[in-house]
Amino acid sequence: MEFVQNWDGYAVRDWMIRNVDVVGYISGIYLAFVFTGPKLFAKITGRDGATSVAPARQGGAGGGGSKAVRRAMVLWNLSLSVFSIFGTSTVTPTLVRNIMNKGFYEATCTFNDKEFYTTDVGFWIGVFALSKIPELMDTIFLVLQGKSTLPFLHWYHHVTVLLFSWHTYCVGSSGYIWVAAMNYSVHSIMYLYFAIAEMGYKHVVRPWAPYITILQILQMVMGCFVTLYAMQESHDGRGCGMTWSNMRIQLLMYASYLYLFSEMFVKAHVLPRWAPVATHANGSLKKSS
């Protein structure tokens, strides 16, 4: 595709460096919406809203909002799924080939700026970083569904990955291909799940929710491992194509996600199975919820 071949990641990077304040404004406006949007929408519509936390999305899927909102969400989620599938088909095979042909160290720690900022791989890495801005639309859709509050994990994940991606694309990172490959792969499945749920088939895909969350947790585990590996190589003197500031941010991001996604998984899928048995007044038993 011509627009992929003509991609100039260097120009995009330079623009992002010159306009680094823009990501601050976007993040500030987004956070203001997180805390005021649901209340404002509830006042306008006269509804109290409802909060529903879906395991994979940190915010609910399926059944809420008007028909127009649900249709828009189907198209939105399908678009993100298709986008992620295209990204996966380019970035993930490249990472796997690099590991098989060059070894884990070279694939993780050798920074090839030409591959990072140009070529078809560079295009999908670049648009991956930029895609964290439109992905904030997820939150707007949750508010339009009538959610009265937005889960911490939902908005924390969105705003931190946006800031991290902007920083990483500006400084360059040999490890960012791991971030893109894993995120693209998981999002290919996750957003398809949400699209099907919004079509009215939540009961069909619901059994797959815990497995999607497990994939997300494994993504965070691998992210922590890759970052710690890069830190170790940098400390031992062999070096790694990641700056220390970026590695620290990346480790903090992945470690916090690992904790939050694991906590969500336990609350959504483990604790309900071990809920205490309650006794009714008539002597019958039921599992408490």
Swiss-Prot record:
It is found in: Endoplasmic reticulum membrane. Pathway: Lipid metabolism; fatty acid biosynthesis. Keywords: Endoplasmic reticulum, Fatty acid biosynthesis, Fatty acid metabolism, Glycoprotein, Lipid biosynthesis, Lipid metabolism, Membrane, Transferase, Transmembrane, Transmembrane helix. PROSITE patterns: ELO (PS01188). Its EC number is 2.3.1.-. Glycans are attached at residue 282. It is a multi-pass membrane protein. It comes from the Eukaryota. Its main location: endoplasmic reticulum. The keyword Magnesium does not apply. InterPro entries: ELO_CS (IPR030457), ELO_fam (IPR002076). Belongs to the ELO family. PANTHER family: ELONGATION OF FATTY ACIDS PROTEIN, FATTY ACID ACYL TRANSFERASE-RELATED. Involved in the synthesis of fatty acids. Elongates C4 fatty acids. Required for the normal mitochondrial function, energy metabolism and growth of epimastigotes. This is Fatty acid elongase 1. The gene is ELO1.
